[in-house]
Amino acid sequence: MFSWGLTFLTIDNSLTNWLMIVLLFCSTGMVFLATILESGTCSAFTTVPEFPAPIFPN
């Protein structure tokens, strides 16, 4: 039980660090990292506000 909790904390820490690294690279404009990782991570963040336009045309 204790070792499972320890493993969960380790996984949670790794995921948090990975997200922070991705956000850091996106905010600093290093898009080549996103190109290596699925080539769409940073562009997905930057194009989110433009999604409602086609869905709700005026």
Swiss-Prot record:
It comes from the Eukaryota. It is a single-pass membrane protein. One of its GO terms (cellular component) is membrane. It is found in: Membrane. The keyword Membrane applies. The chain crosses the membrane at residues 18-38. The keyword Membrane applies. Keywords: Membrane, Transmembrane, Transmembrane helix. Completely overlaps STE7. This is Putative uncharacterized protein YDL159C-B. It comes from Saccharomyces cerevisiae (strain ATCC 204508 / S288c).
